[in-house]
């Protein structure tokens, strides 16, 4: 190695996306390098492992045509950063934050490390207030709160991407506060890539959205940096400009598969299902960047979307994500088969922070008791449906038939809203219309004061 130029001529070996170098003193973990190929073409890389004077470099672009013996590697002394500015809103970028829309790069206001700055836990404020997604099964029953991280658990083939795009197009904060969306897609096939952009343009929301798109044909290494670049952009918008930022990440399963691919290339001892043992820690470095900071007006809210391999809720990806995040929205294959969209199964779904965003001063005073009653009746209706499959609906009693009808109407009218935007007021009114078909004694979870206030309101 030339100690003046910090240049290494000739690499020791290459394995997949990794380049191994010998005799590299004073290298730093996370340091960026430039790799010059025999034909003069340059690639970028990052040091991800140090073992004495031997280093492993993660090549950030395609490695095809890279001959190790003829490569020239220069250590830059820099770490991975992203040039950020408010001008990133309305732009389409690749997974590393480079423009792909044919326009010049936004003028940088700052250059920030993509791994984020450590946040003092004593400065964190608890999530509060409501983000309206326009999706009844989320807003009404699993309310999303500013500063929360609420993942969507999907099965292969379900319209999770469509739902993610719908949330980007419809989401808003109430009260006129400044709001923006950062959308990051990892491993997106061209069809989805094009569909996302078309949906955002058609809905007229691209000007308030920063779009990071890592395509399926892009190197897996880029996939590991995409959510970090997106969150770095979100942190700048939230904590430097005071915006409430919703970050939608899809698909985190593609991210985890790229993490596994790199770990195997490094000959690491695999953990569950071949994923690296540090995957929990790695996911936490992404999910825990959501939140609010005391004394700062902005916030970051995350909606990561992931596909459960083999529809398995105990698979390491959803399992570990569930430990870090604050609830989950679960998509159902059964509802999808019956033509219900979005196919959100509200029974296993949960927003642990719903109480911080629903109720008086945030949505409506009747929100929580109404949601509790709808949950309880729908759960009983599902039980009756299973019983009817055994004994036949003709053998059900009058109360069971009412519950069965309620469950069907709940899925059809409240959950199955289609692509239309539905405000929280419309969602709650839809819930009350469903309850109006039931006798008063069935509404045991709604306090008498709420029922009386509702009755008086209906008389006006």
UniProtKB/Swiss-Prot annotation:
One of its GO terms (molecular function) is ATP binding. CDD domains: ATP-synt_V_A-type_beta_N, V_A-ATPase_B. It comes from the Bacteria. SUPFAM superfamilies: P-loop containing nucleoside triphosphate hydrolases. Keywords: ATP synthesis, Hydrogen ion transport, Ion transport, Transport. GO terms for biological process: proton motive force-driven plasma membrane ATP synthesis. Pfam families: ATP-synt_ab, ATP-synt_ab_N, ATP-synt_VA_C. Produces ATP from ADP in the presence of a proton gradient across the membrane. The V-type beta chain is a regulatory subunit. PANTHER family: V-TYPE PROTON ATPASE SUBUNIT B. NCBIfam families: PRK04196.1 (NF003235). Belongs to the ATPase alpha/beta chains family. This is V-type ATP synthase beta chain. The gene is atpB.
